[in-house]
Amino acid sequence: MKSDNQPASGALLASEKTASLGSVRRRSFLTTLGLGSAALAVTPTARSQDKVIQGFERAPTAPDASRGWKPVSDRKIRVGLVGYGVCQFGAAFSFQDHPNVEVVAVSDLIPDRCGALAKAARCDKTYPSLEELVKDDRIEAVFVATDAPSHPRHCLEVLKHGKHVASAVPAVFGSLEDAHRLFEAVKASGLKYMMFETSYFHEDLYGMRQVYNAGGLGKLLYAEGEYFHYMPTPIDSFKGWRIGLPPQWYPTHSNAYYVGVTGGSFTEVSCMAAPSRLDHLQPANNRYRNPFGTEIALFRTSEEGMARMGVSWDSPGYGGEMGRIRGQKGSYYGKYEGSEGNLPDIKRPPLPPGVEAGGHGGSHGYLMNEFVTAILQDRKPLVDIAQALNMTVAGIVAHESAMKGGERLKIPQLKMW
């Protein structure tokens, strides 16, 4: 899981900081949701002793990663960072290292975490909550790295205060109503919204997108995307939101292997799933009444092709985010094979000096730079609100299909034009 787990509301008591998820059997789960003395904070010190969470292994930054980089402006964007939970996501994208960024304030509800984020971001100003940070008139843009259920509410709060917003995934959490509300708010605001979907800047998906846009693939006939992350015990999360999480509510790492290549969408879905053997994925043990740890969705695409997108929590073995695509004129699985010989450069663009590639396949620095550059150039970010929601909403409907035994369901379409 990649979204950080800062608590959602500034009114929380200190004793309600973080769910302790050592055991997720029925009694422990109810204790966790009951909060009180059973809810324990995960301190930065404790986190540093844990095994690195899948996806957060830092990819090496190539020695020539900044070769050819040219600034598009000499202006510095004033940014606020919110959220420094178990994944320490608030500082993971190197906003603090970008030559066109000044991190002017940070926030986390838990004081120790807030202080650690301030230190990591080399920032002196802290706020006790997002709701207080967004009142700072100096701030132009905010990165929301809070708990996944709070992403839509927090992004709406940022937009309401006239600031650009970047969000960790997913854009919304199981709610089609939140999706439409956020979509309309972004359109009405005229501000930049970007979801930091890491697959977009994986080397393979970046290459797929370049070749597709150059016409080297034609219409895609078939796409596959997979996000496999074995979690017999869920990663710690505020109020245990990861306990029993429906796989297709966290679909963007896999769904990006179509939407992130073509800019298209999914129009209908039939999703199959099997009951899980894991404790936290028993319906009685999670707030979602979710019985599934693996959900495999077959989508119809906006190009009238097909896409198989899978998310799995309960199958041990190889993990990560990966994908393959086949088009009318060629295919791409690690490399391009097809009929077109005149292809574009598929190397990822240069990073600003001092910015590392980071985690999730070396995507972090590229995503942050794309958001910053879109603001400076006053253009649409790559992972805009339409693409963010077309990935996320498709998963919400896919889980509904799985709960209905694979019934084929239509998917709402969200377009900026």
Q: Which residue stretches match the model-derived regions?
A:
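Predominantly a Rossmann-like dinucleotide-binding segment in NAD(P)-dependent oxidoreductases
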Residues: 189-289
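N-terminal secretory signal peptides
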Residues: 1-24, 50-51
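N-terminal export leaders
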Residues: 25-42
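N-terminal Rossmann-like dinucleotide-binding module
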Residues: 40-121
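C-terminal capping/lid region of NAD(P)-dependent oxidoreductase domains
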Residues: 45, 49-51, 191, 218-222, ...
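Glycine- and charged-residue-rich phosphate/anionic-cofactor binding loop of Rossmann-like
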Residues: 102, 374-391
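Contiguous beta-strand/loop segments that form the cofactor/metal-binding neighborhood of enzyme cores
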Residues: 57-69, 73, 249-340, 365-381, ...
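Beta-strand-loop-alpha-helix segment that lines the small-molecule cofactor/substrate pocket
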Residues: 141, 147-148, 152-200, 215
